[in-house]
């Protein structure tokens, strides 16, 4: 159906690929807010309209930020040909930002209960969305919100679904892991 991968070019620069061809992911961050329903779209047509407009404006992907949409949204992305970077919605503690420091070794610490909830919810999201080919990149942490044990989360995500790329914390603290 589709293959998402990465490959170094002749200059050593990592390029994202779709079906073994370089494919620059270009798209907006979409929080999925609706003026008359906050997180719930008023109609299926409204879901479709937003995705189609994104494509019409020249984008080829959407970073789904802070929420998981209903199944119809992903079905529309599949049909229209929009890739999705799916974030894990915010969780636990406020972000701890490591400004201009790509890895200090410091990360948030969660309670055992919070860790278990995170892991269950992330697995449930991945299971729910697994069959949608539009999902190209899993993002275990939205920015730095609740970011903890980043390398373990990225490795688990990659092992659980090796058919997709992993961006450990899109817009968050960089760690030496993921794709």
PLM regions: where:
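Secreted/periplasmic carbohydrate-active enzymes, especially glycoside hydrolases
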Residues: 1-76, 80-81, 136-137, 153-159
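Substrate-binding/catalytic cleft of secreted carbohydrate-active enzymes
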Residues: 61-179
